[in-house]
């Protein structure tokens, strides 16, 4: 999609192994005239997560954090732009949160960019340039308060790590199920797994639904199963799945 608006260089990829790992991004071949380096920090389809941010060699880092936002503490000073839809961990679909370094909020944008697609438009209008999705924002506020009551992002991270460990430990020991991501790059939010038999995968999803487990079918592009264990999923839910 980005190629519609400018030149794009793919600096690193794990396509060679079905995106089952995060490639080494410590010494990327970044062109001098690059405007920014972009990553999707957590891949919901393949279940991978950047545990270490790329070395952008001074270039601005832009990150889509839709599926890992507020799942753990983040040093925002390492980014130029952090953005994402709230529908995974914060609130209902239809709201987007963007955290932008102030020097990047300018009128210096691609020629032809519509007014309402400029960050500066919304920053200047305090996010009220057009009618905001008030109810969605209200729900986000309730979630923020809930997060604080849980002990903040440090406590949420600890709980998310505990949930993920329960599931990954089971998969690593199982003779039937197998995780699809190398251990060091595993997501805390999305856990894909397979049996190695498509018919058996389908049977598992069907039987799991009867047992009260919804949406365990993997993304249509990869198949298998996927357990999404976002902030709202209690530890008990993961324990029940393992049982």
Residue positions per predicted region:
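Conserved PLP-binding catalytic core of the aspartate aminotransferase-like
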Residues: 177-208
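Active-site C-terminal subdomain of aminotransferase-like
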Residues: 86-168, 182
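PLP-dependent enzyme catalytic core of the Aspartate aminotransferase-like
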Residues: 210, 219-243
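A short linear hydrophobic-aromatic micro-motif
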Residues: 176-180, 212-218
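General beta-strand structural signal in soluble alpha/beta enzymes
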Residues: 10-13, 39, 61-65, 83-85, ...
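Active-site phosphate-binding strand-loop segment of PLP-dependent enzymes
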Residues: 2, 14-69
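Conserved active-site segment immediately N-terminal to the catalytic lysine
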Residues: 62, 76-87, 96
